Regions:
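Nucleotide-activated chemistry modules centered on ATP-dependent adenylation/adenylyltransferase
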Residues: 1-184
């Protein structure tokens, strides 16, 4: 019987490589799109639409815990002035991965993992550390992967284009949008 894996998905483009590969490895893989860190809401909707396209392609289901940006802001707002990659991002990773691990434990999943490590801009050691901590806290296995290895990011860009997926130009929160020069 295959292991049930809950795959935390930060965005559809970043899931184009991990989702099919986990499935090919024999995992019964379900996506988990946290999304409450994504601002504004119109951006969340664009990313959700892209995820629905990918979901149809990989023929799998996705858990949508609900869009609740106020819950995310209550944790991250105190770090609004932090640069991209700082304490705010650590809090954001922990918020998302803890929500995924909790859901996995409460819904009979054996393991949890994330697509976050495909990005060349993210601290993969920190992501995997937080993932392992939150999985242990909830009694599920953490499947550590560094998806950006072996040109993972480049392959995800190519696959996203092939599928016609929306590709965003900032991580997700309004602060990362500001840091990328989108918002003044």
């Amino acid at each position: 019987m295959p292991k049930k894996l809950l795959l935390h998905i930060c965005c559809a483009p970043d899931a184009t490589i991990p989702w099919p590969e986990f499935t090919a490895e024999g995992f019964e893989t379900t996506g988990y799109f946290y999304g409450s860190n994504i601002h504004p809401e119109e951006e969340y909707k664009k990313r959700l639409e892209a995820l629905n396209i990918l979901k149809a392609f990989v023929r799998a289901s996705v858990v949508l815990p609900g869009y609740e940006p106020s819950a995310w802001f209550s944790r991250a707002e105190q770090f609004a002035k932090e640069p991209e990659g700082g304490k705010r991002c650590e809090v954001c990773f922990r918020t998302q991965l803890e929500a995924a691990a909790r859901y996995a434990a409460e819904n009979g999943f054996d393991a949890v993992s994330t697509t976050l490590t495909i990005s060349p801009h993210k601290n993969v050691a920190l992501i995997n550390k937080i993932g392992a901590e939150t999985a242990k806290k909830y009694g599920v296995e953490w499947i550590e992967r560094i998806w950006r290895k072996n040109n993972g990011f480049k392959r995800s860009v190519e696959e996203s284009r092939r599928l016609g997926l929306y590709r965003q130009n900032y991580c997700g929160c309004i602060y990362s949008r500001r840091d990328e020069g989108e918002e003044q």
